[in-house]
Amino acid sequence: MYFFTPPQKRTLKPVVDRVLQQQQQQQQQQQQQSLPKFQPFEVETYSLEDEKYLYNISYFSKEEIKLLYDLFHRINLDLDGFTENIIYQTLSFLVHIPSGIEELSSLFYNEDVIYRKEINSSHRSNQSFNHSNSTTPLNTTNNNIKKPTTTTTTNSNNINNNGNVNGNNTTNLDDILNNHNDNYSSDNSYLHNIYDDIYEDEDDEDDEDDDDDEDEDDEGKEFEQDDEDESTISSMSLKNSQAKRLSKKMNSIDLNVDEISSTHNQNHQNHQNHQNHHHHTTTHMIEKKITTTINKIKQKISNESSGLLCEVVGAGGAGTEGASSSTTTTTTLSNDLQTNESIKFVEDEKQQLKQQLRKQLLKDGNHNSLNNILYDYKHPNDINTPIEELTAAATTTTTTTSTTTTTNDHQNLEKTIISNKTIKKLEGVETIKDTVELEKQQQKQQQTSNVTTAKVKDTILSSSPKTTTTATTNNNNNNNNNNNNNNNNNNNNNSYKYNSYLESSNISNISNASYTDKPMDDEYYYGEYDDEDDSKPPSQEKIESINLYRSQFSIIRDCNLWGGKTLKEDEFDYIDSSSEILKYRMIIKYMVENLFSYIRKRYNLEANKNPSIIHLIEIISIMTRGTLKEKSELVFKLVRKKSEGVVYKTELLEMIQGIDALTVLNVFGLGSIGTPDEVVNNIYREGLSTVNSIQRTPSFPRSDSFYQKSMSSEQPFFKDTSLEMKEFIKRSVSNSDIPRCFGFFDLIYLCYIKPIEDYLKSSIKYKQASGYLYYEKYLGIIKAYSLRWFEVRSGFLIGYKRLFSKPSKVICLFKTNVKIIPKEHPKHHMKLKSLFKGSLSKQIDGNKEATDFVLRRFDDTEQTFISLSSHRASNFVNAIRENSKGSYRYHSFASPQEDINVVPYINGSTYFKGVYKALKHATSEIYIAGWWISPNVSLNRTATSKTPDKYRLDSVLMKKASEGVKIYILIWDETMIAMDLGSRGVKSFFEKMHRRNIKVIRHPHMLPLYWSHHQKVVVVDQRIAFIGGLDLCFGRYDNEYYFVKDNLEINFPGADYINSCIAKPVNNLKDCLVDRNTQPRMPWHDVSISLDGKAARDVTYNFIQRWNHAKDSNRDYKSYPYLITSLETPLNIPHPQPPTQFLHPNTNINNNNNNANNNTNNINNNNNNNNINNLNSSTNTTNNTNNTTTTTNNNNLNTSTNMLPINNNNNNLNTSTNILPNNNNNNNNNNNNNNNNNNNNNNNNNNINNNNTTSTTTTTTTNNNLNSSSNNLNFNISGEIHNNSLPHQLNNQQQQQHHHHHHHHYQPPLPPQQRGTCKVQIVRSVCGWSAGQVLENSIYKAYLNLINLSQHFIYIQNQFFISSVGFTQPNNQIAFAIYKRIEKAVLLNQVFRVILLLPVHCEGDIYDVDTQLIIKYTEKSITGIKTELLKKFPEMDIDQYLSINSLRNWDANGDIIFTEQIYVHSKVLIVDDKIAIIGSANINDRSLNGSRDSEICAIIEDRDLVDSRVNGLPYKAAKFAHNLRCNLWEYHLGLISNPDPLLSDRIKDLVIDSTYHDIWRNMAQRNSAIYKEIFGTTIPENCTKTSQYNRGSIKLTSEALETLCGINGFLIEYNTSMLSELETPTSIYSDIITSMKLFL
C-alpha cells in the first residue's frame, strides 16, 4: 500500500531555502516599500472561544483572525460605520498602486465634471420621467412658486442648481434635515430612487417629508409661511448625526457659493485680480454666517430647546420662505437698512430686470434657451416651473447679492448668471439629433447669455452706490456682533481648498470650445496628463483641484491602514465632498445593507441588531476564499428578492447596476466589464440571447445606469425570467462574474484580506512551502495514506514520490481553495473509522499535532492532506492561498509585470527568424503550442547556405533534442468534422525523431468537437516567450513585399505556396495544392511579439498548466512527465558576475585547450563526479543515463543562458560568465540578406542579437574540466522534471567556485543586463476543458475596457470582426463598445477615429456556405455601427469617425496579371498610441467567450514616451505602441519598398485630417477604384452576388499595366456591399459548421 525510501543525508527543503533566500529578501524589500502602512495594535480583544470557532469554521489562519479582530474593534459595525470603512480601505489600497495617487486624482476630477454634466443633460432630456413608486421630490409635481429668500439660501439655491456637490435642490432647512433619515426601504424600488436622492444628502437617504415644499405654492403668503416653517422646524427632533450631516451640508453651500463667485468669464479676464479679492471677501462673510448657524444648531441640540431652534433658523438664514427683500437681508444687514426705502429700491430693481429678461426671452423665441442659461443644472421638477417664476428667482438672486457685496461684485454676479453654459451632452442623451442642431442651439444660447449679462451688468452698475453703503453697514454690523465673532473661525482653514475644488470641478469653468475640442483626461489609465490635447494649458482651477486631491490622497497613503480612520474626518473633507465618494457611499451602503439583512437571517438576529465581529469575519472568509459554490450561493442570497427560492432578472440587474457604477473598479480593471444588461442576459439566456445589444443598453448614460430605473422591463421582447438557486449556481461555472459578485467581493478582498496577506508575507515565508505530507487516496473503496514530499512553487503544488526524482503529482493552484479541517469535522481523520489500520494510520492517529487541510478545485473535487505538524500545515495553507490568486486586472491569471523587453515581429519572415535564433540557443527546454504545426516549414529563408534544410523546424528540434534539450509540443487534436490538419502525423513524426527528449500531446481527445486550441506559443528555457497570431506551419511565412507569385520556389517552396481561398491545405502534404503558373498565392500579414522576464514566466505558467491538464485528461499520456516552473530568477537585480579582476577578455580558463578544437567531448554524468558542468553544458542529461556523448561540429561551443547568438567569428571560447556588451560588428554574417528592407523594425529583428533584443550575450564553456560558478545556479536550473540534476547541481556548487580564479588578469567591471521599459500583462481565454480551471475571459474584458477609455483613436487589425450591435447574435459587444465611443465623440464634437483593418473575406471558397455567412455577419457588425449612429445623428458623416479597410496586391506573371487579397491574420489593438494588445484572439465569440477556443494575448504599455502629435498638437506617445503602428502603416502604404521620409513623418499623427483623409482614406479609395476598373468581377469585393463572381486572372496589356502602376501600397477600402444581394443561406450544414465558426 505504501512504499517510500527516506533520504539518507539531504532533503529538498534546505536546498530550496538556500536557493531562494536572496530572492525572498529582495521581494520582501520591494513589498515593504509598496505596502500600505499596516501596524496592528496587537491588543487582545477577543476570546479564545471566538478564535477557536473562527479557526474551525472560516478560511482564515489564527494570525489573520487576530488581525481582523483588531480592525473590527476599531470601527463602528453599524451600517454607516462599515460602509465608511470599506470606502477608506479601498482608497488606501488604490493609493499604493504605482501612480495610484495621480490616477485617482484625475479620476475624481474627471468624474466630478462628467457626472454633473451627464446628470443635468439627462434631466433636460427626461423632464417628464418620474417613478411611480418613488418617495423622492422627483415624484411630486413641483408647482411651487419661487420666492425671494435670504442671502444664504438664495445663493445656495443657485449653487445646488450649478454644482450639485453635497446639497439637494431644495433650499429650506427643514427639507435638508428631513433628507437625513436613517430608514432604508427594503423595497425593490429603493435602487430606482437612489438616482433622485444622490445629491440630496451625503448619505443618500430617502426624503420622506415633502410637505415643506408644498408650503411654497403661494407667493402672497410669504410672511405667514415664514413663521409657519419656523414652528415646523422647532418641533423636529434633531440628532447628533443629523447635526453633523447638516454641518457638511452647510459647508457644501459655502463651497457652492465659492464656485459661483469663482467662475471665470472670458470677457472680463483683465479684472481677475480684483475679482479674486472680492471672491475671498464674499466667501469670508458667508462662512461667518454659516458657522454661526451650525454652532447655534449644535447648541440647540444640547439644550433641547425648541425656542432656540427657531432663533437658529432666523439667524442662520436657512428658511427659504422669506418673501420680500427685507427678509432677505435680515441676517446680514443692520436694522437701519431694513427700511421701506431700501425695500422699495430692491423691488423696483427686481421688476426692471425681470421685464428686461422677459422681453429678451420673447424676442429670441426660445424659452429653453433662457432656462439653460440661468438654470442649466436645474432639478427636473424645478425645470417645469414657469418661466416667470424662474426669472423672478434669478432676479432675486442678483438683486439680493448685489445688496450684500461691494461695488465691483457685479463681475461675480455676471459670472453667476452666465456660468452655467450649456455643454454638449454625453452618450445616451437623445434630445439633440445631430451636431449641426447642437451647434445652432449653442450659438443661440451664447447670444442670449451675452444679452442677459449686459442687462444685468447695467442694472447692477446703476445701483452700485447704494450697494457700497449696504456692504459697509453690513460689515460694521458683523464686527459688532459678538456671537458671530466667537464662532466664525471653524471653516476658514479650508476656504482655499473649497474654493479651488468648486472652481475646478464646476463644468461651467470649461468653455464650450475648449471642452468639445478635447476629450476627458486620460490620466487615469495613461498616467501623465497630456496638456497638448488642448490649445491652452489646463486652468488654474483644475490644477489646484487635482493638487488638493493629491495632497489628501497622500495623507491616506501615509496613515496607518488599521487606524480606524474614515473620510468623515476633517483632513479628508475635500475627497469626502467629491461626487465619486457620494456615489460610492450610496452604492456600498446598499450592498452592506443587503449583507446585514442576510446575516440577520442566517444567524437569526433581531431586525435592527448589527452583526457581530464573528459573523462578519465568517462571511468575509466566504467572500474572499470560499469555494465557487459557496460564493455563488452567497451572491444569490445578497440579491433583494421577492421570493427566497428564485431570483428574477430584474432583481439581479438591480444589484449589478449598482456595482457597475463603482467607477474605480472598472478603471482599475477590477469591475464587471460590459453593460449590466449584457451580464444578466449571459446568465439568464436559454441558448442564444433574445435581446440585442441596443435593446439591452438603456439610452441614458452608462455611469447613471444605477440611479435610473431599469428600462429593460419596459423594452419589447423583454421577459423577466427567473432562476432557482441550484440552477443559478450551476450557471456560475460558465460565468466568472457571479462568484465575484460582479466585483464587490474583489473590493472586500482588497479592503480587508490583501493588507493582512501582505503584512504577513513581509515576516513569513509565505510564497513557498515544502515538507512531508500524507495525502488520502482510495484504492477502490479502501482509503489509504501516502507519504510524499510536497512543495508549493510558482502556482503549483508539486509532489515527489522519491526525492530527486520526477514529480508524481502536480496540482495547479489557480483559484483553488484550501481550508483547515477542525477536529470536530466529520471528515477529520480522527472521525473516520478505517477497517484496515496500518502503521501509517496508527502513526497519524497517535500524533496530537496532526492537522488536516483540504484543497478544493474549481470543479469541487477535493484532496485531503495531513501534516504531523500544525506549523507545517499552516505554512502550506498560507503558501497555497498565496499561489491560488487570480483576480488581477481584467480578472486575469497574471498581474502586470514591469521592466519587460518586448520585440514586435511584423509578418512571418522576421518572426520565424527570431524563433529560429531562440531555438538554436536553447539550453534546457522548449515549449511549443499551436493550432497547426508543420514539421517541414523553413524558419530562415534569407540565409545563404548549402544545406537549407538545416533551417527547417524538424531539423532544428532534432539537433536540440540530441543535445539534451527537452522539447514539449502541445497541439490541437482537430476533429474531422472541422478540418484535417494532420496533428496525428505531426505527433508521430516528432516523437520518432527522438523519443526520449521530444514529447507531443494532442488535446482534446474527444470532446469538445467544435472548440480548438488557438494559442500560438513558443517558450525557450522559460526565459523568452513568443506569442501572437503566427503558427509554425505552411502558408504563414511572408515579408514586406507580399508576393502573389513564386514560380521558382525561392521564398515559398513546395507546399508553402498556399491560397486557402482556392484550396484549403489538407494534412501536411509536401506538394503544392495550387498551380503556381495560373493561380496566385495568398499573402499573409500577421504580428507577433517576444517577451522576457516575468512576462515570459507567465506565458510559461500558461503552457505548463495546459500541458499538465492535457496529460491528466487522457490516460494515453500517463507516462508523460509533468512540467513545473523553474526556480524564479530574481530579475530585479543584475545578473551575478564572477570575480572580474582575475580574468582577461582573451584568456581561456582551460590552459590545455586554448583553441578548443576538440570535436568530441565525453561527458560523464555520474552523480559522484564533481567535475561536471551540469548547468550550462549542452549535454543530454536524463534520469537513467550515466554516459552521454555530444558531438560539436564547429569551433564555437558557446551556449547562452539568455538564448542569444554569440560571436560566430571567434574561435576561442569565451569562458567568462560576465555579461558581455553586445558587439554589432560580429553580426555581419547574420545580417547580410534582408532583401534591401529599409524598415528599421525589420532590420532590428532579423537578428535577435541586436540592441533591441531582450538581453545581452553571455557565454559559457562546455568542457569536461570546466565547472560553473555557484552564482549561476538561479539562472540555469530548468523546469524539466525527470532530470535529477537539481540536488546534484546544488551539491557541487561550493566545490566548483575556485575554478573561476585562474589567470590573474584585470578586467574592468561590465554593465548589468539592461531592463526593459514595458509593463506587460498576459491575458487569455481558457476554461475547464482547455486548461482545467474556472472560466477566464480577460482578453474580452481588456478589449472593452481599453475601447471605453480611448481618447483619440482606436486602431484594430483582426482576422474577424463578428460582434453584436443591433442584433441578437453574437453575444460579444466589441462593436457596441465602438459604437458607444463614436457616439460620445459626436456628442462632444471630438475629433476621434476608429480604423479597422480586416481581410477582404475569411479563408475559404467564396462559393462555400460558411464563407458567405461569415461575410454576412461581418457586414452586419460593421453596418450595425453605422446604422445605429445614423438613427441618432441622421446628418453625421460617419467617415469622419470610422474607416474600414483591407489589403490587396497584384503582380504580372507572364502574359497574365495576378491579384489576391493580403490576408490580415493579425490580432492587434492599439489605443491612442499608448497601449497595445497583441496575441491570438479574434474578434468573435469563439475567441472572446472564454469557454470556447483557448487564446492568449499581451497588454503592453511602454513607459518610455516619445514626441508625437495628435490632431496637430504636441503629444507624448508610448514608444512601443507608437512605433508599432507607424511601422504597420509603412507596410500598408508601401513605404517599406518606396521610402518617403516626409510621408513617414506625417503618419505619426493619425487623427489629423491631412493624415486620416488625405493619406489613409484617399490612398485606399484611389487603390480600390483602380482594382475595380481593371479586375472588375474577378475579385469578390466588386460582386453583390456569387453569380457575378468570375474567379481568374486578366490578360496583361500595356494599358492595364500602366493603370495598375498607379497603385500605391496595398491599402484598399472594405466593401460592405460585397454579396449584399445574396440571401443569407441556411442549411443543416450551415447550422452546424458555420455556427461553430461564428458563435460557438
UniProtKB/Swiss-Prot annotation:
- Tell me the ranges covered by the PLD phosphodiesterase domain, including all copies: 1009-1036, 1460-1487
Q: Give the source's domain of life in one word.
A: Eukaryota
Q: Which residues form a coiled coil?
A: none
Q: Name one GO molecular function term.
A: phospholipase D activity
Q: Does the keyword Repeat apply?
A: yes
Q: Explain the regulation of its activity.
A: Inhibited by butan-1-ol.
* Family listed: Belongs to the phospholipase D family.
Q: Write out the function statement from the record.
A: Plays a role in cell growth. Hydrolyzes membrane phospholipids, such as PtdCho (phosphatidylcholine), producing the free headgroup and PtdOH (phosphatidic acid; signaling molecule on its own). Involved in the inhibition of actin-based motility and endocytosis. Its inhibition causes complete collapse of F-actin organization.
Q: Could you identify this protein by its name?
A: Phospholipase D C
The species this protein was found in: Dictyostelium discoideum
